[in-house]
Amino acid sequence: MDILLVLRAILYRLRQGCSWRTLSIFGHWETIYGHWRRWVDMGLWEQILAEFFMRARGKLWGIDSTSCRVHKHAFGGVKGADYQDIGTSRGGSNTKIHALCDAKGKIIDIFLSPGHRHDSNYAELLCDDVPKGITILADKAYDSDRLIQFLKERDVKFCIPSKRNRTSARKVNKGHYKKRHHIENAFQRLKEFRVIATRYEKHRENFLGIVTLGAILAWI
C-alpha cells in the first residue's frame, strides 16, 4: 500500500476522530493500522519531535498539563487502566498530557500520565534536557523545593509563582509569566484533533503516538 495514502488515512483519522475500521475507505484498514503500529513501536514520532526540540526558539519555555476525556472504548488494555495511563478524577476517567513548549508555543516534549497524578511529578522529566539559560514558565502547581533545586542545579532559570503556604513568596517577573499563554494555546491546538480531545486508544503507546503526531503537525 502506498505510504502517502497511509499517511493521508492517519491524518484523516486524527482530524475526524473515527475508528480505525472506518479507514477502509482508503484501503485495507488492517494494513494502515499495521503501518501505524510499526511506526509507534519504532518510536518514529518521538524521534521526529526530538529533531524539532533542537530547533526550539526563544528563552521562555513553558510546562503544563491538560486532561483528555477517556472514551469507554479505551478501556480493556493489558495490565489495567493505570498502566495504560488512564486515571479517575472529579471529571471522570481521563489521561493527562504533560508538555514542554518553546517561546513560540510549539510543543517539543510530551509525557502521558493517569489523570489523577499531580503535575509536579512529571516536571523533572519535561525539564531534563532543557539547556542552560532557558527560563521555565509554570503555574504554582509546579512550586516545589525539589523542582526548584533541580532547575538550579542545571543553571535553568524559572518563573513559578509561590504557593500560599510558602513562608516567603518569591518575586515573579509578571511580563515573563504572561507568556504562559503559549502553552495553553498549544494545548488548544492539540485538542482540535478529535482523537486527542477524547482518547479512544486502549494502548498508551498508540495515544502517545497520536498526541506526538499532533504536536509535530504544528511545526509543519
What are these regions (language model features)?
Residues 1-220:
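Short alpha-helical elements
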